[in-house]
Amino acid sequence: MTAAGLLIAIGIVYGDIGTSPLYVMKSVIAGNGGINTVGRDLIIGTISLILWTVTLLTTVQTVIIALRATNHGEGGIFALYALIRKKAAWLVWPALIGGAAILADGTLTPAVTVTTAIEGLKGLEFGKGNVPVSNQTTVLVITIVILLVLFSIQRMGTRIIGKAFGPIMLVWFAFLGVMGLINIGGNWWILQALNPYYAIKLLFSPYNKAGFAILGSIFLATTGAEALYSDVGHVGKGNIIGSWPFVFVCLSLNYFGQGVWILNNTNMHSATEINPFYAMIPENIRLASIVLATLAAIIASQALITGSFTLVAESINLKFLPRMNILYPSDERGQIYIPAVNKMLGITTIALVLFFRTSAHMEAAYGLSITISMLTTTILLYEWLVLKQGHNLANLLFVIFFSTINILFMGSSLSKFTHGGYVSLLITLLIASVMVVWYFGNKVRDQNGAGNAYVRLDEYTDMLTNLSHDDNYPTYSDNLVYMANVKYNKFIKREILYSILDKRPKRARAYWFVTVNVTNEPFTAEYAVNTFGTKNVINIQLYLGFKKQTSVNVYLRQIVHDLIKDNTIEAQPQEYTTTPGRDVGDFKFVIVNDVISPSTTLSSYKKWLVKARVQLQNLSLNPAQWFGLEFADMVIERVPLILGKQEHERIKRVAPVDYSKTSLNKK
């Protein structure tokens, strides 16, 4: 834990939870009929609910318990799943659903935080009688412009602007605390909210018109708690533990201050439109506060966008999602940019802004997906605790207590289902469906694909060598290159050899099997060779840094020259060439894709699952782009994907019909 580390943590981790004061109290007041209908008991109970929700779900569950469950220093729901996935097969379900819910939140957080911040400008005078932002349409235009700029700059990375995140968020939290203290004044009776009795009492009190549905608004105070866990790998456990007390105190003071201001201004009009956060700020600094709030909202949105990129990259590694083009704007592997994800996030976020139009409507959708992710994380945490400590009463009480709390919040969020909650759920289900199809489609294919099993490449080297010298077959290419994942330097998918040997035998001077391995270093450019004691069967393991372009065509030509030079393989002199002395022949690259065979005997559901998985593969990253083969001679071959038990019904032979005795023959 260092001062610099604490500052970085404040800038990266707390953006989402740090912007919650912008809309939590506003949502509670609107749900109870407006500012002129609330009383002291409601406000004290509300703040008590907020403080104890943040204490239990953020401080206890996340900071005290979840931060212990790191995977080589990395946190988050997928890192947690990776720790326990061998324990039980069903654990993949909470991991998939929770991950999908967090990705869904990545579209909602930028929409609601930026819109809420900009709404503070509405009705604000710039000079005498000049009100440039007088309606919601203007708010939407400004919000969309900010979001467009935010998503457009992602390709450049956040290394430079990211240095400002810490100082800006430090000022933001200090501002929250100071504004809270100013509005508390001498009204220290508000500290009664520290007593959880008032939180429980509020849920059953008649002056709480929203009933248990109030929890849907209260939960907004702890959205962003999952970031403390998922970002632990970026900023370090010690820096999160050290910075959280400061953040918690500043948030608490601001909620106290809003509560006092509300009770001192219950006679105001515009009952449901008042935002106590902005209203309690003195007019002479309100514009500055809106600018600061907008910056905090942008930083919160940036954190969610960056987190979404990281989550998708982890999903790809766990085979929850198909392969995508991942770029690295800086020399640090943690700084990634996924164009497809950025485009989908940007389009969805702006569509949500246009659909809901106001932050009040967005708040109805916001929160539901996070309650889902928190519940699934609780389940996975319990399994991790059992794995580490065994079954005991403490672990059982943990899962019962926190699952009950999360289910209560989920139920209250579902009360807003028809008012916008369905949007959050639909986005979550859509993402989860893609994950389910890809993950279980792969499972079905691997478990039932006898024809796609791995075989030993060294057992086929003699056959490949003989084919290379067999004049009965025309030369298909001088160098036939298969992009194949060769495991342990010798195991290769049978479908690759099927393509060479069974599908019109392909004669070549040299057969190349290339595996691309991405390393944790940014600029690695190395290769290893295994020829299996031959001159024309070569397994190449490429080791490329995560910032290196995967230009297999360029690298392979250099490798061929190196191997010819040291006599590892034979030269390939060319009789007809524009380059005198050329000793390397042509290259043909082959990508093998699966196509479901009609002989597949799987159940209808499993067959549909594999077909859907193949369709997703076709829609994902083009192999030519992935391997840098856009200008190479490349073919994509389809091989039959035969799944399930093969049952070939025998056909019975009969004697031919004797037409000599028919009337047709007599004519």
Swiss-Prot record:
User: Can the keyword Membrane be found in this entry's annotation?
Assistant: yes
The membrane topology noted for this protein in its Swiss-Prot or TrEMBL record is: Multi-pass membrane protein
Task: State any single GO MF term.
Answer: symporter activity
One GO CC annotation: plasma membrane
Reaction equation(s) it catalyzes? K(+)(in) + H(+)(in) = K(+)(out) + H(+)(out)
| Compartments (UniProt record) | Cell membrane
Q: Where are the transmembrane segments?
A: 5-25, 47-67, 88-108, 133-153, 164-184, 210-230, 243-263, 287-307, 336-356, 367-387, 393-413, 420-440
Q: Which UniProt keywords apply?
A: Cell membrane, Ion transport, Membrane, Potassium, Potassium transport, Symport, Transmembrane, Transmembrane helix, Transport
Main localization (coarse): membrane
Q: What does this protein do?
A: Transport of potassium into the cell. Likely operates as a K(+):H(+) symporter.
**What HAMAP family does its record include?**
Kup
Family under the similarity heading:
Belongs to the HAK/KUP transporter (TC 2.A.72) family.
Please identify the protein, giving its name as recorded.
Answer: Probable potassium transport system protein Kup
Species per Swiss-Prot/TrEMBL record: Lactobacillus delbrueckii subsp. bulgaricus (strain ATCC 11842 / DSM 20081 / BCRC 10696 / JCM 1002 / NBRC 13953 / NCIMB 11778 / NCTC 12712 / WDCM 00102 / Lb 14)
At the highest ranks, the source species' classification is: Bacteria, Bacillati, Bacillota, Bacilli, Lactobacillales
